[in-house]
Amino acid sequence: MAAGKFASLPRNMPVNHQFPLASSMDLLSSKSPLVERRADAYQDVSIHGTLPRKKKGPPPIRSCDNFSHVGTLPHSRSPRHHSPLIQDVIQEQPLQDWKGEAFTFRDQHLLDPTLEYVKFSKERHVMDRTPERLKKELEEELLLSSEDLRSHAWYHGRIPRQVSENLMQRDGDFLVRDSLSSPGDFVLTCQWKNLPQHFKIRRTVVRLSEAYSRVQYQFEMESFDSIPGLVRCYVGNRRPISQQSGAIIFQPVNRTVPLRCLEERYGASSPDRAHEGSLTEGRPDAAKRLSLTVGGTQAREQGLPRGNLLRNKEKSGSQPACLDHMQDRRALSLKAHQSESYLPIGGKLTPQSPSVGTSPCPNSPVFRTGSEPTLSPAVVRRVSSDARPGEALRGSDSQLCPKPPPKPCKAPLLKAPPSPSIWLNSEANYCELNPALAASYDGASRLPFCAQDSYVELLTAKQNGGLGTRNSDTSYLILDDDDRTRPWKPPPAPGDTVGEDQDTFVMPLLETTSSFKPNDFESKLLPPENKPLETSMLKRAKELFTNSDPKVIAQHLLSVDCKVARILEVSEEMRKNMGVNSGLELITLPYGHQLRLDIIERHNTMAIGIAVDILGCTGSLEDRAATLNKIIQVAVELKDSMGDLYSFSAIMKALEMPQITRLEKTWTALRHQYTQTAILYEKQLKPFSKVLHEGRESTCVPPNNVSVPLLMPLVTLMEREAVTFEGTDMWEKNDESCEIMLNHLATARLMAEAADSYRMNAERILAGFQPDEEMSEVFKTEFQMRLLWGSKGAQVNQTERYEKFNQILTALSRKLEPPPVKQMEF
């Protein structure tokens, strides 16, 4: 017993019996007393209760298993005696003595003082992966020195290239990772112009003297002593990473788990595993990738130090690790993330080498997945979309690929344009419109299904179980349906007659010119050619505005808005050209670009016109206060009576311009002379406008009271460039801007669905309304453009017009109330 692990324990202990260690199942009952037996009568048994398989030849003396924390007893050469205490133990390979008698080695009623430690060792993996433990470990990393790369959440360690690309969501996102192709170097991954880009951080050693040198990091020109310093410079100064790409980084993509978890998941893997999916951070119960023990792999694993025990248990790769206790692993509810192939083990295996004495493996619920060829080539298996707990385990190609694969091409895949016959077959495919295709279509045969590049067709393919072409060379063993088996009817010839009652889909027209034509506008108030801000025209417009009731003004605004947004007075021909029944649907579609530009043009022009109405009052302070009072009353009517949130937002935008808000004397006069109006503006209109622009319109406005919804957040988001740093709205500078943007997009979907409701509300509100010709002309966009910029300036570029008029408004504001002059001290 000198070689035993417990030979030094005192023999007078009531639990000191030279039996093999018991498993946790032995705690269920303890009925019969324990009887001492000879230690050499039993074979070594793992502490997890799994009996070893018998190999050919004499049983070898093995060292402790990787999953055994205490050890096993040595073999004995003496004959084994049957123990009456050991019953109902299932053996995988029962050993035979010289007489062919089978023996068992476990006692169900056996107790051992190391049992609690065994139980702890089984649950140690679960305890190490709790969210609290991971959060604490992440906080410890982030509390390191700022010059330590691990203290920055944008550093993700050794993650594959494709995983880093999947983490990029918008332009400006970035992270830093270790280079898998050249260990020791770092790569900055970012997104710019909707394309992920990778920049290797150059690492140079500067030798200051024979005994001292330092490492510096750089992209192109300037070098830095540390990577955090480099990132701070490029983020803070908005400096392009390279002059050729022009990529700018400003939004870090932070990790949500400690680097240890990323190392365990991706550290030992090859870049090929990057195609398996994006990083599932924040899920500590995610599955470990495991595989079965094959042959003599156990001997190689024993050479690892004990300090790497967790890595041994959680080893991933096609070079498999050891699974001693499958039932314990199934208790952890491990989920398998499947890859391209799905290879069950337990059927016919590839013959092993004669030197490795293995017996046929019984049917097992364990599966192996990886990117190796299938073990059974005759069977074609389909990829499953989900995996039940404990059903599948996967491997990787960590040691099968000595060098990294070629990097994916950044150029977009060239595909054939979609066939116009698709538009003739379905009304749902007008989202990707090309006006040149209909004219060039000559009745040729339709393109293969895989060449269609429509999002609607992709969804249809997924619903039917088929997939199109992929942007990779990987074979997924999926039998795609042959396109030739699909029935297709050719479009009718030009000479064929179609019944009048038969509905035919007419391809929408892609508008390329604005509906506002200032020079072609026939006006009763403006001459054929006029200069910007003519005094006579300003006085006439102000006279009409001052002498009219606020409700009448609001009705005229609503009438013009409904025509511009194509809510009312939409002809049948216009509906066919749009492809939809309302402009509220058109602005949500890709080819509604021109209508969105027109809506933005009218909104900005209206806001500037209101600001000119206030700042153009060169008379007394009381006149400006009266004009301000009338404008606020019109805003109240638009909000409560008309339900025109579009014009309401234009008035609120004008009142919140810096050139208007700085007029302290004017606002003070408003509070003194029109106290109720000032209170109404501060307590109701401003909070209501804020709620609208935060996407909470449905919580404060009844749907049956809205005739024109809030349009500007949606059209601004859809028409803005990929990245802008100036001209953002107030809600975009909020901490919850992402959630607010999602609310606006969800509201746009509801707005398109309820287009008929808005139309009926507008018709009900404007029932019996008789517009005044002159006032209707004043509130038309063409008139306002001619009045503000003149007949020639109205044709200038929109951005240039707005910039120049912003300077004019600033000059008018300073003329009315000059800024205080700072006295110089001598």
From Swiss-Prot:
Residues modified as N-acetylalanine: 2
GO molecular function, one term: guanyl-nucleotide exchange factor activity
SUPFAM superfamilies the record matches: Ras GEF, SH2 domain
Bias (Polar residues) ranges: 350-361
UniProt main location, coarse: cytoplasm
Domain SH2: 154-253
Subunit structure: Part of a complex comprised of PTPRA, BCAR1, BCAR3 (via SH2 domain) and SRC; the formation of the complex is dependent on integrin mediated-tyrosine phosphorylation of PTPRA. Within the complex, interacts (via SH2 domain) with PTPRA (when phosphorylated on 'Tyr-797'). Interacts (via Ras-GEF domain) with BCAR1. Interacts (via Ras-GEF domain) with NEDD9. Interacts with PTK2/FAK1. Interacts with PTPN1. Interacts (via SH2 domain) with EGFR (when tyrosine-phosphorylated).
Residues bearing PTM Phosphoserine: 32, 78, 83, 182, 291, 359, 364, 376, 472
Comment block on domains: The SH2 domain mediates interaction with tyrosine-phosphorylated proteins. However, not involved in the binding to phosphorylated BCAR1. Required for cell cycle progression in response to INS/insulin. Required for regulation of EGF-induced DNA synthesis.
A Gene Ontology biological process term: epidermal growth factor receptor signaling pathway
Gene, per the UniProt record: BCAR3
Required for interaction with NEDD9, annotated site positions: 749
Name this polypeptide is given: Breast cancer anti-estrogen resistance protein 3 homolog
Localization (cell): Cytoplasm; Cell junction, Focal adhesion
Processing and modification events after translation: Phosphorylated on tyrosine residues.
Modified residues (N6-methyllysine): 335
UniProt KW keywords: Acetylation, Cell junction, Cytoplasm, Guanine-nucleotide releasing factor, Methylation, Phosphoprotein, SH2 domain
Source superkingdom: Eukaryota
InterPro entries: Ras_GEF_dom_sf, RASGEF_cat_dom, RASGEF_cat_dom_sf, SH2, SH2-Ras-GEF_adapter, SH2_dom_sf, SH2_SHEP1/BCAR3/NSP1
Chain residue ranges for the region called Disordered: 46-81, 268-287, 294-321, 348-406, 480-501
